[in-house]
Swiss-Prot record:
Residues that bind heme c 1: 52, 55-56
Full protein name: Diheme cytochrome c-type
GO cellular component: a single term: plasma membrane
Pfam families, alphabetized: Cytochrom_C (PF00034)
Compartments (UniProt record): Cell membrane
Function: Particularly expressed when cells generate energy via aerobic respiration.
Its membrane topology: Peripheral membrane protein
Species annotation: Cereibacter sphaeroides (strain ATCC 17023 / DSM 158 / JCM 6121 / CCUG 31486 / LMG 2827 / NBRC 12203 / NCIMB 8253 / ATH 2.4.1.)
Length: 296
């Protein structure tokens, strides 16, 4: 009996240790960036494609003030309220002291410099696709922006969601980066996939989620309840979005639909970002969206 109990306890300990190892916060290897030099001019393109200002600018900021990434926006969800952090280059209150590898750890692994899990209100499951050179370029651009000394505020989450240790299990369930739309894609469509599935993180809102907040990838971009709890997000697969590729590209540039309506709500902010992109990126997004499987 004693040997059975000892063996059982050993198995429990081994299983627990394995679970902790599998769900540990993962950081990027600094060697990944050896020989890479970030260029701010390229990083600005990554900045707008990634929609950084949409969350990290101060609430209601406009114009040049959107480049002060002081945070403070409150995201209300079924899990509680998340307060967006300061990612300005301030060394004390922002990310001015981060290395490129620190930024990559956050973007692609959802891990802080202190090796703790970030909540997936930060869309690192999409940013996991971002290329190392783009991370280096983004860091170079972020370092040129105005600093803010606004201190971060804690999230307002109820138990058990206020326990970051559970996020390792959530990440394990979410899986690693894999492309949704595969097959023989033209270079323009591949670029669009990178922008939509990766940097632009369109699936974070336009794809429905289950009770754990995991995206239902079988209904990719088919719309669903707003993750922030207000209204619904539309289906942008070809089953519902019947615009031409040119119409889509124009909407991402001007915000005007083929029916001369205009983008509103959260999409108005998205268009403020996509309007800063070069024409070829907007055309690439449109080309990709025409290749997405139609889902009713």
């Amino acid at each position: 009996m004693r040997r059975s109990l000892t063996a059982g306890l050993a198995l429990v300990l081994i299983a627990g240790a394995a679970g902790l190892w599998l769900t540990r916060p993962v950081k990027s290897d600094p060697e990944l960036f050896a020989g890479l030099t970030g260029e701010a001019s390229r990083g600005e393109r990554i900045f707008w494609a990634g929609g950084c200002a949409s969350c990290h600018a101060a609430p209601d900021a406009s114009g040049e003030a959107r480049l002060v990434l002081s945070g403070g926006e409150r995201l209300t969800t079924d899990f509680g309220t998340f307060v967006v952090p300061n990612i300005s280059p301030d060394p004390d209150h922002g990310i001015g002291g981060w290395t490129v590898a620190d930024l990559d750890s956050a973007l692609r692994h959802g891990t802080s410099p202190e090796r703790s899990h970030y909540y997936p209100s930060f869309p690192y499951t999409s940013y996991a696709h971002v290329e190392p050179q783009d991370v280096a370029d983004l860091k170079a651009f972020l370092d040129t922006l105005p600093p803010s000394d606004r201190a971060d505020e804690p999230h307002d989450l109820a138990f058990p969601f206020n326990q970051r240790i559970i996020l390792g299990g959530w990440k394990l369930l979410a899986g690693g980066p894999s492309w949704i739309v595969e097959g023989d894609l033209a270079p323009e469509e591949e670029r669009g996939r990178y922008l939509v599935e990766g940097l632009g993180h369109c699936g974070e809102c336009h794809t429905p989620r289950n009770g754990l907040g995991l995206r239902d990838k079988s209904r990719w971009l088919a719309g669903g309840p707003n993750p922030e709890g207000r209204g619904t997000i539309p289906n942008i697969t070809p089953a519902k979005l019947d615009w031409s590729a040119g119409d889509i590209a124009e909407y991402l540039s001007s915000g005007f639909t083929p029916d001369y309506d205009s983008a509103g709500g959260q999409m108005a902010d998205v268009v403020r970002n996509t309007s800063q992109l070069p024409d070829e990126d907007r055309r690439a997004i449109a080309a990709y969206l025409k290749r997405v499987p139609a889902i009713e």
